[in-house]
Amino acid sequence: MISSEAMPFASTGGLADAVTSLSSALIDNGHNVKVLLPRYYGISRDILTLFDGQLCCTNKIEDIFVSVYTASIQTQKNNTLEFYFIDYEKYFGRDGIYGTVDNPNYDDNPQRFSLLCHSTFQLCRELNWFPDIIHSYDWPTALISVLLKFYERKNPEFSNTKSILTIHNLGFQGIYSKHLFPTTNIEWKYY
């Protein structure tokens, strides 16, 4: 699962509950599930464990190195649900998940959540864990399906991986200027 929100760590509404509830139910039914989300400013590093090494996510301008943290919770059947947090201060070390009260949408949200999506594949490689399905939620993680189809499926480890996108709130579509598209590290032909 990849999401911008998950309980009990980051929430603005029902999305966080849905992500954690579904992940927990799948774990309790014998599936191997991991949840990936950003380590926002409001998620204290004190409650997380630093994962060994950094991930390198290359965009067209620079190599971005992100730290990864982990945490876990117990499900209703006392199974362990693992969470992985992408930590990059420039994008996620600020108040608010998507923006602030005065500015509800950060101007760099496309870059922020693109980094999260690109990090997904790097983290899977680092864990040597290649899921059957990558389930993404809402516009912040919708890029996963594009990355999988046009880039990652060429790699043998993701050749059988499928993607699911669940929309929880159609009112938030992540519509930004097309001039920001290159910052997602996706070729123009896919615009």
Regions found by a protein language model. Give the residues of each.
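Catalytic cores of nucleotide-sugar-dependent glycosyltransferases that transfer UDP/GDP/TDP-activated
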Residues: 1-191
